[in-house]
C-alpha cells in the first residue's frame, strides 16, 4: 500500500483533486492524458468493473481500513493520499462522499463509425458536458 500522508495542500500530486478545472482534467489537446474524478466507493467500484484505470486515491484516514479497504486492494500500487476530513475538505472544497475520491484515466473518445455501427437509433445532444 502506497499511503502518502498529506501535510500541506501544496503537496505534489494533489492538484487533480483541488486546483485543476474540469477543462484541464479533460485535456482536449492531449486526450490520452485526460482524467476524471470518481466520487464514493460505489462509483469507483463501478468504474473499475468497467475497466477504467485508477491513477490515485484520496481517502480520509479513517476509511483506509473501512469503506476504502476493498478499493485499495483492487487498485494495486497507486498513490493513496490521506489525511483528516478537515484537510481534505479544504483541498476539494466539499466533504468527500463516503470519504473517498479516485482520479481515473478518461477513455479515448470512440470514432463515430464505431458508436453507430450496430445502432438502431442515435440521439444527438448538443451542449451537454459530462
Residues covered by each model-derived region:
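Boundary-proximal intrinsically disordered activation/regulatory segments immediately upstream
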Residues: 1-67
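RNA substrate-binding interface of SAM-dependent RNA methyltransferases
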Residues: 4, 42, 49, 80, ...
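Solvent-exposed alpha-helices and their adjacent loops that cap or buttress functional pockets
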Residues: 28-30, 73, 93-95, 114-118
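Structural motif
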Residues: 35, 55-57, 79-81, 99-102, ...
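A secondary-structure boundary/capping signal
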Residues: 39, 60, 83-84, 105
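Generic structural "secondary-structure junction" signal
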Residues: 39, 90-96, 106, 130
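A short acidic, glycine/proline-enriched capping/turn motif at secondary-structure boundaries
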Residues: 63-65, 86-89, 97, 107-110
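A glycine-rich helix N-cap at a beta->alpha junction
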Residues: 72-93
Amino acid at each position: 500500500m502506497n499511503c502518502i500522508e498529506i501535510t500541506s495542500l501544496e503537496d505534489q500530486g494533489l492538484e487533480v483533486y483541488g486546483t485543476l478545472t474540469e477543462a484541464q482534467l479533460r485535456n482536449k489537446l492531449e486526450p490520452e492524458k485526460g482524467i476524471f474524478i470518481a466520487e464514493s466507493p460505489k462509483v469507483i467500484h463501478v468504474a473499475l468493473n468497467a475497466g477504467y484505470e485508477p491513477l490515485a486515491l484520496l481517502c480520509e484516514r479513517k476509511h483506509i481500513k473501512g469503506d476504502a479497504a476493498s478499493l485499495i486492494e483492487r487498485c494495486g500500487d497507486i498513490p493513496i493520499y490521506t489525511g483528516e476530513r478537515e484537510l481534505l475538505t479544504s483541498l476539494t472544497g466539499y466533504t468527500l462522499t463516503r470519504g473517498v475520491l479516485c482520479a481515473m484515466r478518461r477513455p479515448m473518445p470512440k470514432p463515430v463509425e464505431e458508436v453507430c455501427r450496430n445502432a438502431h437509433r442515435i440521439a444527438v445532444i448538443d451542449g451537454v458536458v459530462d
